[in-house]
């Protein structure tokens, strides 16, 4: 009896144990990452040929304690290598693990190689050559703390390489894991199986091979036992012949069918090639189509299983499309696949929740470094009185109501950008802004007392409902997360896409960027203030301080300002402002753009203006500004400097986002100024619920 070890992906050990026992293995013992077992020579070959789950089959040769590199050398040399190798066999060493002595795996591999070679030369035998690419024998050494475990890798290349897939192709899951997913899916061979996001077809191919009794090792060309002296070619040929006979019989007797589809024509072509190379191409129908086009291939029965490894996203900007995809799949399953089973393998349990289905079973597994889950569902047959489940129903109803209210108003006023929803319902704590045919959903970061998983799931529900209610393409929804705004974090860079969208606001054309910054380049709550500036600016010299992207300057210019001066500290936003001005035909010397610390520029300037707009941050301590600024504390000093630049009969429009801001009216009077609060006049109906989003004042000479 041979003592053997089969390695596998984490989470598949018990499944592998059952498989090995069915092959005839005895004394199976599960450990993390594999199964120890025993069997005769025939079982060695059967496990290599038939195991769908094992990554490698190892023949342990011994262990040694390693307190120095000499211990490793002597421990390896103690094994009778000359009885292991056939004459002329090449070999390679795979060394993994480190300790205080062996701190480099390449060094460890070199010591093992030296010990093996010296074992031959000391007996005056020809030394075996090393072949790292295609060796006849692979020696595996695993060092854990002070113990080195030495084994022959009888597999050669990993057993997931079945021989039917182009090794250069990108594979989201290995064939061994795919086989486990099929086994755990609840699918019964002889019933239909469908993968609507099949990629290169691995799940369907593994299922078809299982159903037709086709050994996973049948197509492999090289093995790790070709240079092993104990290899029994006669028994191996018997095992191989039996596998070929069973495969032919299984294929001839199988009558059910497999269906695969994907939106990428290139991967579908690869899937067809892989299936043909696996010998089961005639059983699988592959089509190029999107999940949205998915239909039941057998509407009159029999029932089957939908099995897939859907995409998941690591970036925030990919989530809306994935949420929409999973929500859509859930709806299609309920509408067209009543009575079927569904099994999905994913690295994102939250996305699976978007299906709005209750899982009957779930399994955990590792896909490389990723923690994954497989969930199995049974889709109930629909009845005439069954109603589709609503996602975030209260939120969806409010959004639908707001849409009806605001859409007509915005169209009549020539507004393409407006707020549709602003945390109207406390449990759905987001803002939803429309920019032409795009939508930005901003999640206000939930308090730490809220369970993170529940908050994330609620956000996914919000996105699914938003896409459904507004009828937009998922790729036109942008998702952002922000703290409740404390001042304007307008300079925070989020990305580098550089994609700008032209929008209209009354008679102005403006550029917005929905993805690269926390804000988009257009503060929607100031829309009416900008229109007022346009109406007040005819024939006047206009100054815009803390100008951001210059949208107020555009309105002033279009309103007939004699000149405009736009000042901001950011070169990025001044260039953006210049693009906005140019888009509206506002060019030339009468439209100046100045990059400067606005407070320092204000103290040094000696020009005169008829109309000044200033929208400073609530608080700023930027390294590029000379002093820290607090709008509540410093607004009088600001007014003193502004008064010096204000021409007789001129007006200052002063706005800020400080909640609870108190204007020092007595202090203003001492400066010879008076203030009229116009906040309510500047709040449009889409911001009527948030009356503290800004405050706005007109300041003139007393």
Swiss-Prot record:
Keywords tagged on the record: Cytoplasm, Methyltransferase, RNA-binding, rRNA processing, S-adenosyl-L-methionine, Transferase
UniProt keyword S-adenosyl-L-methionine present: yes
Name under which the protein is recorded: Ribosomal RNA large subunit methyltransferase K/L
UniProt main location, coarse: cytoplasm
Signal peptide range in chain numbering: none
One Pfam family here: UPF0020
Lineage: Bacteria, Pseudomonadati, Pseudomonadota, Gammaproteobacteria, Enterobacterales
Family: Belongs to the methyltransferase superfamily. RlmKL family.
CDD domains in the record: AdoMet_MTases (cd02440), THUMP_AdoMetMT (cd11715)
Domain THUMP, chain residue ranges per copy: 43-154
PANTHER family per UniProt: RIBOSOMAL RNA LARGE SUBUNIT METHYLTRANSFERASE K/L, RIBOSOMAL RNA LARGE SUBUNIT METHYLTRANSFERASE K_L
One GO term describing the cellular component: cytoplasm
Subcellular location(s) of the protein: Cytoplasm
Keyword Hydrolase appears in the UniProt entry: no
Record GO terms (molecular function): 23S rRNA (guanine(2445)-N(2))-methyltransferase activity; RNA binding; rRNA (guanine-N7-)-methyltransferase activity
Catalyzed reaction equations: guanosine(2445) in 23S rRNA + S-adenosyl-L-methionine = N(2)-methylguanosine(2445) in 23S rRNA + S-adenosyl-L-homocysteine + H(+); guanosine(2069) in 23S rRNA + S-adenosyl-L-methionine = N(2)-methylguanosine(2069) in 23S rRNA + S-adenosyl-L-homocysteine + H(+)
EC number: 2.1.1.173, 2.1.1.264
InterPro entries to which the protein is assigned, alphabetical: 23SrRNA_methyltr_KL, DNA_methylase_N6_adenine_CS, RlmKL-like_Mtase, RlmKL-like_Mtase_CS, RlmL_1st, SAM-dep_methyl-trfase, SAM-dependent_MTases_sf, THUMP_dom
Function: Specifically methylates the guanine in position 2445 (m2G2445) and the guanine in position 2069 (m7G2069) of 23S rRNA.
